[in-house]
From Swiss-Prot:
Species per Swiss-Prot/TrEMBL record: Schizosaccharomyces pombe (strain 972 / ATCC 24843)
Pfam families associated with the record: Rep_fac-A_3 (PF08661)
Subcellular location: Nucleus
Keyword Nucleus carried by entry: yes
Name of the protein in question: Replication factor A protein 3
Keywords from the named record: DNA replication, Nucleus
Family assignment from sequence similarity: Belongs to the replication factor A protein 3 family.
């Protein structure tokens, strides 16, 4: 069975060192192998040559959080240009409050 990939926001990333997580965010800027992403706060994400992101699109990113809290993109799904991030924030909080429903 695969390990669960909990949903998080930017402010939760330091707690996720060494883990694979999901994070919904907006790709604000993409330059080379780095993207600036906003998900309840801005952070830089390392890309590979296989990753192409459209600026101003929302994505669900599956990322690896490194021990230094840097973020490496593993895969993503384009969610388009209109996501209610307030609802996503509530989903994240709900999923952590009732983690047995989502992670076990």
């Amino acid at each position: 069975m695969e390990r669960p990939t909990p949903r998080v926001t930017k402010d939760m990333l330091p707690e996720c060192s060494g883990k694979t997580v999901r994070i919904v965010g907006k790709a604000n800027q993409v330059e080379g192998e780095t993207a600036k992403v906003d998900s309840n706060g801005s952070f830089d994400m390392h890309l590979t040559v296989d990753n192409t992101l459209e600026p101003n699109h929302f994505y669900e990113f599956v990322v690896s959080v490194k021990p230094d809290s840097s973020v490496q993109l593993l895969t993503c799904v384009d969610f388009g240009t209109d996501i209610d991030m307030e609802v996503y924030q509530k989903l994240v909080l709900f999923s952590h409050k009732y983690n047995s429903l989502f992670f076990e």
